[in-house]
């Protein structure tokens, strides 16, 4: 498999530290607000990577963290009067619900920073002991001047605009130096004094705790949004070099921005489009399809028109799924599977891979039109659809349930009552009443289909 390494700035062959195994760490959200589409893009992109590696036969260990102690969370506490736990638990639950809607696989481990304080403190202590951290009146700082390879990850330089992203403090030895531990009597005990961890000290310690390897690298792949490359990932890598005398990750992968009106989408810019808002207009899988249809490294401008176009492509997959309802899957068509995996093995070339999916859907429908009772064809189509679900994470729903999107629970209850009434009418051979109920449902924009599995319905 070929992946784009952000450090080498080119595609390279993925050769894991341990043959047949892949360790991946993805920077998760800071939980002070609902997830926006930028968070979703990152989660879905690297969920796709994980799925592809699994399909290729790798054993994957996947960790995604929660930053649940941070300046932004403290500001939210101040603004709302709520506790740290109230805020973080609310937004972790919100994020989890969004990820479930997007059919993102659960990480193997999803640590919170507050659960890893001992590991974080020990990591900072190691940096202090090695003489690469120093104390100021407001906290413990990392001395970037002690790391000869600082900037080697991002390829940046002493650009003033970039350095401005690092928290300022006139007493720092160098403007690039960053805080490891912030003194604050309200928080946690440590050998340095009461306080809380700095953002950059959290992820590197969690990687050490959950994914560490002997040898030259801690993990195979460190992933996240391209906006994290500097300073966050640069600072993580610097700490690992100085504390462990090794590289944090063998490969670094970054997804691109989602823009709104050609500006990067972010909470700080106030132009966030939340996942929960997008999910009001389309099913979660349609949003997922939209996000993976563009290459993970591409920056693209959010468009509702493109979102609906993505849903129409997904609709075709589900309409095909309905045509093989109740069919047991046979064997996936080898050439189709090979074409998809070949494209995805080229740095997740989803455009090419999804073109193969579109071609399969068309040819499958053509085949069923010619021979609708061909059991072998139906079994192969069902197997191909299962493969699509495993790899792309779409097509997992019941075919009819997918087309019930937008129907309220009250409406579903009314529809069920009418269908039950129709079933009873048919049992009593009162076919005129059954037809009347069908017409009544059609007037409600509900289409019904009698199948071996029972009467199914969908929103027209």
Curated annotation (Swiss-Prot):
Residues bound to ATP are 267
Q: Which UniProt keywords apply?
A: Aminoacyl-tRNA synthetase, ATP-binding, Cytoplasm, Ligase, Metal-binding, Nucleotide-binding, Protein biosynthesis, Zinc
An example Gene Ontology CC term for this record: cytosol
Cofactor binding notes:
Binds 1 zinc ion per subunit.
Q: Where in the cell is it found?
A: Cytoplasm
Q: Where is this motif: 'HIGH' region?
A: 29-39
EC nos: 6.1.1.16
Q: Give cofactor(s), names only.
A: Zn(2+)
Reaction(s) catalysed by this chain, per the record, are: tRNA(Cys) + L-cysteine + ATP = L-cysteinyl-tRNA(Cys) + AMP + diphosphate
Molecular-function GO term, any one = zinc ion binding
Q: Can you tell me which residues bind Zn(2+)? A: 27, 203, 232, 236
CDD domains referenced in this protein's UniProt entry, alphabetically: CysRS_core
Q: How does it assemble?
A: Monomer.
Q: Its family?
A: Belongs to the class-I aminoacyl-tRNA synthetase family.
Name of the protein in question: Cysteine--tRNA ligase
Query: What is the organism lineage in this UniProt record?
Result: Bacteria, Pseudomonadati, Campylobacterota, Epsilonproteobacteria, Campylobacterales
What gene is it encoded by?
A: cysS
